[in-house]
Amino acid sequence: MREPAFWHRPPSLLSRLLLPFGAVYGEVTAARMQKVGIETGVPVLCVGNYHLGGAGKTPTTLALVQLLRDLGEHPVVLSRGYGGRLRGPILVDAKRHSAADVGDEPLMMARTAPVVVARERTDGAALARSQGASVIVMDDGFQNPALVKDASLIVIDSRRGVGNGCVFPAGPLRAPLPLQVARTDVMIIVGDGQAADAVAAQIAARGGPVLRARLAPDETSLERLKGRRVLAFAGIGDPARFFATLRASGVEIAEQRAFPDHHPFTADELASLADSARRGGLTLVTTEKDLARIGPDAASLGSDLVALAVTLVVEEEARLRRFLLERINQARTKQFAR
């Protein structure tokens, strides 16, 4: 879905008219969040966000996986598999499954990490354990109470923050902000904007680490784009951030097209992109997540298609590493005491 523009402006007449619906939605979500979850037997780290749409959870999840591997752990990612038809639990095979099977984000992550998809997170956790998981990393699921979380890491975009601060449909929030803040252990702010500073101050006041991070484009991909004019397209939570990343890296965008998050590209849309690129002498560039969704149909876009990979770089990585060690050790001590 495309996010309404009023979600990211000061409260308007429309958002005020929708506040009663937001109050009901918020009450239901808040009651659900306060249910007691099930212990999995291994530490569970959740990467989530406060609002609907993208914030950088997937690159954060992959960065967390790498940090855990550096600490000697065997992390397995657990995802609901949004956009996929398979309910799971299933271990994603990047060579066998498609985005239509398991969702675009799990398919993309499965190229570098073991990923389990399951609508029922308890079943997914059991499969992850059977795959030798020493730590489960939940990609999304902050508002889901199914599993006991040993740490919740919230990702927030520095330019968008929490929008107008209202609960869906009056705003982008999935649940009332105070409840979500109270359950946050770490906040990771992506980018150098200031829109998230107010909520970050609340986390810091509670003693939680607030870490700055940035998305670093893959140098090999950028080298392929050097000196070229491009047609950039993306169907992700925040296409504008992708376009801004390209421009900040010195890429000349001659044309850009934004699609809704998880957008299933049609043959006509792909043909239109290829035709526009050919007529303008442009190189097509998109995200890894979009490429996972396009799948074999990418051949219709030509050999010049570039999928820009990005990596999350955390400024105070040592601080995050210490936090992870502490929470993992606490979780294991708690499990041993039982």
Curated annotation (Swiss-Prot):
Coiled-coil blocks: none
InterPro entries in alphabetical order: LpxK, P-loop_NTPase
Enzyme Commission numbers on file: 2.7.1.130
Cleavable signal peptide: none
Any one Gene Ontology BP term: lipid A biosynthetic process
Keyword Coiled coil annotated: no
Top-rank EC class of the record's enzyme: transferase
Keywords: ATP-binding, Kinase, Lipid A biosynthesis, Lipid biosynthesis, Lipid metabolism, Nucleotide-binding, Transferase
Catalytic activity: a lipid A disaccharide + ATP = a lipid IVA + ADP + H(+)
Pathway field: Glycolipid biosynthesis; lipid IV(A) biosynthesis; lipid IV(A) from (3R)-3-hydroxytetradecanoyl-[acyl-carrier-protein] and UDP-N-acetyl-alpha-D-glucosamine: step 6/6
Protein family: Belongs to the LpxK family.
Function recorded in the entry: Transfers the gamma-phosphate of ATP to the 4'-position of a tetraacyldisaccharide 1-phosphate intermediate (termed DS-1-P) to form tetraacyldisaccharide 1,4'-bis-phosphate (lipid IVA).
Name used for this protein in its record: Tetraacyldisaccharide 4'-kinase
